[in-house]
Amino acid sequence: MYIQMKDVVKKYGEGENTIFALDHASLELEKGEMCVILGPSGSGKSTLLNMLGGLDSADDGTIIVDGCDLSSISKKELREYRRNKVGIVFQTYNLIGELTVRENIKVVRDISAAPLSIEELLKDLGIERHAAHFPEQLSGGQQQRCAIARALIKNPAILLCDEPTGALDSKTSRDVLQLLQKINVKYRTTILLITHNENIAPMADRILRIHDGRIVENIINTRKPVKELDI
C-alpha cells in the first residue's frame, strides 16, 4: 500500500475544550489512485492534506508514505520529503508576480532532485504560448495551470489539491479537472483533491467523505471522464 494512515489524531485544546481536527482517521491508497475528498468547512479535509504533505504532525497514529513513517523521520528527511515527494496546489495560485510563467516553474525545478522538462510540462498543461507572460497577464485558469506546473515540475509522487477550482468558472474548472485526470494517467501521480462540489466526485477512483474529523465514507469508484460530469 503506497499511503497508509492509521488512527491519526490531530486535536487542539484540552479537556472539555478539546477540538478534534482529525479523530482516529484511517486511510489506505494505492500508488496512482485519484481520490476526491468531500466534507463541509472545518470537517478536517485540509488537516488531512497537511498531514500527508508533511506540513503538520499528528498527535497520535501513524502516517506512512512509500514505506516512510512521517512521524519518525528527521527534520532534514522531512524537508526532502516535502521538496521532492509532494506537490501542492491551492485555490489561490501563489505565483511570483515579477517572474514569467517559465521563471516561476524554473524556481522550483532548480531545487528539485529529479525534475521534469519545463518545455514538456508547459505543453502538457497547454500554456506553452504563455511561457514568457507574467501572472497578471494570464486568466484565472491559466494562472492555475501555471500553479499546477510549479507543483508538478519536481515530479512528485503525490499531488495534493485544496479546492483547485474553487475560484474558477464552470468551463475553466472542467478544463483544469480534465488536466488533472491527464496528469494522473501520464505520470501515475497519486492525487488527492479537496472539493465542496459533489459533482466532481465521480472523476476519482476513490471518494472520501469527512465529517467532524472522521472519515465516514470511503467508496471505491469507477471513474468517469470529466467531460461527462455536470460541473
Language-model-derived ranges and their functions:
Residues 214-231:
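Conserved beta-strand-loop-alpha-helix hinge in the C-terminal portion
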Residues 2-204, 209-210:
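ABC family nucleotide-binding domain
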